[in-house]
Amino acid sequence: MFDTVCTLPLSADLFSQAIHPNEPVVSVGLSTGHVQTFRLPSEESSDDDDGTASNSSARNGKGHIDTMWRTRRHKGSCRCLGFGVDGEMLYSAGTDGLVKAAKAETGVVENKIAIPLAKDGSVDAPTIIHALSPQTLLLATDSSALHLYDLRIPFSNVSAKPQQTHHPHDDYISSLTPLPPSDTSTSGFSKQWVTTGGTTLAVTDLRRGVMVRSEDQGEELVSSVYIGGLASSGTSRGEKVLVGGSSGVLTLWEKGAWDDQDERIYVQREAGGGEALETLAVVPDELGKGKMVAIGLGSGGVKFVRIGMNKVVSEVMHDETEGVIGLGFDVEGRMVSGGGQVVKVWHEAVGSNDMDVDMAGGKRMFGGDSDDSDDDNDSEDSEQEQRQPVEPQRKRKKNKGKGKRDIIAFADID
C-alpha cells in the first residue's frame, strides 16, 4: 500500500513529531531537548528540457531533505510539538517546565510560557500540546491537568498563567482530538475536544469545561482520532472518534454518545494481550482508499484498518525493534512515521493492492541529521538550511517499553 521514499536517521530518540498543515515540512523533538525541522522533497512532477514530464524527485531519489533549522530548545527532553493552525508557529514543551513558541520557518523563539508547577512544587512535565485555534493553546501535563492559554494576551517573560485549567481524567492525558466546529460556528475553529487518560474518555468544551466522562473501559486508552463522512444509519450521524488501546483493540465511539464505545476492532492480537496502538492518523480521502485509519504500533509496525469493513487490510514495518510514536500525512499525501532514532517518509505504492500485507522495509535515499555544529547550551540560535548526506541506518536495542510517559503519541495537527 505504501513504499518508503526515504529513511532519516536522528541523533537521539524521537519523543515527538509534528507535520506542517500547509507545507511538506516535518519537525521532531528529541530526548536530548533538540528540535529539528526538515523540508521534504516535493512530490510534484517537473518538466525536463525536452518537454516531457519526469518522475518526481521524491520518487526517483534525486531530491534532498533540507534541514531548515536545528537547536537545543529544551534542557531535558522535548516531549511535545505542535504547529499552529496556519503553520506559522511551532510550539514545543519540555521536561524543563517550559513551553516555547517559535517561528516555524526560522526557529526563532518569540514567546515562553512557564508550565504551572505540580502540587509538590516539582516540574509538571507536559504530555500533549495542541493549538486549537489562533487564539487558544491546549497543554496537558503528567498531573492530569489540562491548561488553556489565550494567545491573544501579551505574555511577560516566562510568567504567563493559563486562563483555565481542567482535570478531565484521574491519570495523565494520553491523547487529544479536536471535534469539528458546528454548522453554526462563526469562527470556523473547534471549541470542543476529546481526550483519553487512564481508562476513560472525556469531552471538554472551551466555555463550559468538562462536559462528560465515559465509563471505565477496563484498559488504558492511549491514542485517538476523529473520522467523519461515514455512512449514516439509524441514530448514527456518520461521525466517530476512534480510540487505540494498550491491548491492541481499536474502539469506535459515536459522536455525541460518549458514555461507552459502540464497536471494537482487534488490530493486534497476541498471546497474553495485544500490542499498544500508540498513535492514529486518518488516511487522506484524496488517496482513494475509502475511510481508512493508519495505526502505529508499539511493536514498530503500521497497520491500516478500513472503517466500515472494520478489518486490517494492509501493514508496513517502520522498525523491527522500536515502537511508532509519531504518525501522520503531509500536505502532499505522504505518510510520515517516527520512532526510535528514525523518521520514515512513505508514498503510495504503484499498483498496490489494499488487501495485500506490505512489509516493505524501505530503501534509504536520503540521510539524517548531524550534531557537529551543536553545543550543549540551551541556545536559541538556529542552524539554517543544510543538505543531508546519506547515512546508513543503525539498528538499536529496544530500550523503551510501552506505557512510559516520556513516549508521547503525537496526533496529527488539524
From Swiss-Prot:
Cell compartment(s), UniProt: Nucleus, Nucleolus
Lineage: Eukaryota, Fungi, Dikarya, Ascomycota, Pezizomycotina
Compositional bias per record (Basic residues), positions renumbered to this chain: 394-403
Biased composition (Acidic residues): 369-383
Spans of repeat WD: 9-48, 73-112, 118-159, 222-263, 319-356
Gene: jip5
Keyword terms, alphabetized: Nucleus, Repeat, WD repeat
Region (Disordered) residue spans: 39-65, 357-414
The protein's name in its UniProt record: WD repeat-containing protein jip5
Main location: nucleus
Family in the record: Belongs to the WD repeat WDR55 family.
GO cellular component, one term: nucleolus
InterPro entries in alphabetical order: WD40/YVTN_repeat-like_dom_sf (IPR015943), WD40_repeat_dom_sf (IPR036322), WDR55_POC1 (IPR050505)
PANTHER family cross-referenced by the UniProt entry: WD REPEAT-CONTAINING PROTEIN 55 (PTHR44019:SF20)
